[in-house]
Amino acid sequence: MAKKIQGFLKLQIPAGAANPSPPVGPALGQRGVNIMEFCKAFNEKTKDKAGYRIPVVLTIYTDKSFTFELKQPPMTELIKKISGVKKGSDNPLKNKVGKLSKAQIMEIVDMKIKDLNTDDREVAAKIVAGSARSIGIETEL
């Protein structure tokens, strides 16, 4: 018989750095999930993605067990890391803080395509370019 789902929980946690302190501990504790078990499993699966915040979707079952699915880092984090920018522009229409080439955009598309709502790489490239422009980074598209 399949386990009965109690609920879902979405978190963004730095890769390899999950610990019982807030926000992870309280979010899991109030649902009765073994916090240390989750932290160890999450840190093990994300140790190779250090430097990124990783979105995770936890499925919590009525017997207090859980499974989790890792997503790709947020698009703006990938854009900033690949373009070498530390922070987005405070006024993206006037102040440009960096530039992305078509090759860099396609690199981001390759990482994010499974999390986007399209399978077409050209459409995905436009989504990435739009996100880049929204934080003040020029694009070659």
Curated annotation (Swiss-Prot):
HAMAP family: Ribosomal_uL11 (MF_00736). One or more lysine residues are methylated. The lineage of its organism: Bacteria, Pseudomonadati, Campylobacterota, Epsilonproteobacteria, Campylobacterales. SMART domains: RL11. InterPro entries: Ribosomal_uL11, Ribosomal_uL11_bac-typ, Ribosomal_uL11_C, Ribosomal_uL11_C_sf, Ribosomal_uL11_N, Ribosomal_uL11_N_sf. Part of the ribosomal stalk of the 50S ribosomal subunit. Interacts with L10 and the large rRNA to form the base of the stalk. L10 forms an elongated spine to which L12 dimers bind in a sequential fashion forming a multimeric L10(L12)X complex. GO terms for cellular component: cytosolic large ribosomal subunit. This is Large ribosomal subunit protein uL11. GO terms for biological process: translation.
